[in-house]
Amino acid sequence: MSANLAPQIVEQLDPVDGPAFQRLTGCTDAQLADLTRFQALLTEWNEVMNLVGPATLPTYWNRHAWDSAQLLKLAPDARTWADLGAGAGLPGVVLAILLKGTPGAKIHLVESMTKRCKFLRAVADALDLPVEIHNARAEELDLKVEIVTARACAPMVRLLGYAQPYLKRGATAWFLKGQDVASELAEAATYWKFESDLRPSLSDPRGQIVQVKGLKSVRKV
């Protein structure tokens, strides 16, 4: 494993509401309305299925919307994405809202749990999003995308296995990770050879965004 672990100064950005989020991202009024509608749907469906921790819903704009949207700053020209373990629509639905109307934009939402796919379809239909929902395991699909991403999906050692087919087909990986990322990368390095680069999260001072390239299996997980 080759990793850039140098500490970096993070500008703390805390969009506590929709207008603050709009100032940070430059999103349109229509996109802001879609994100607000998504917030309502996420809150409604979360009452009957475990999509996100209930305690995180009051901080939706920072914890979920901005946490997801910051990926577009890392890959501003990417139009095709695959979100692995996309059950709550994070980051995939947020990306789809912000890319809606962009020529060639397509977000693949990959989720193995049927009931969560039902939620994703309800959101996609309500907001008319440029998404394709795959009720399947990530490693079973034959998708060619520019970026593969995931949030709260699996430890890095398993996540790399899910992402490997996408990387083989030319994708770059950007994974949203928390404060345990260093230990996750160390564990993953016993099974995989890869290059990684860490970027500080703009939504959480404890979080990191991990870029992965050059992935090769060393031994079976």
From Swiss-Prot:
Name of this protein: Ribosomal RNA small subunit methyltransferase G
Main location: cytoplasm
GO MF terms, alphabetically ordered: rRNA (guanine-N7-)-methyltransferase activity
A Pfam family of this chain: GidB
Gene name tied to this protein: rsmG
Binding residues annotated for S-adenosyl-L-methionine, in chain numbering: 85, 90, 138-139, 151
EC category name: transferase
EC number, as in UniProt: 2.1.1.170
TM region(s), chain numbering: none
Role played: Specifically methylates the N7 position of guanine in position 527 of 16S rRNA.
Gene3D superfamilies the UniProt entry points to: Vaccinia Virus protein VP39 (3.40.50.150)
Top-rank taxon: Bacteria
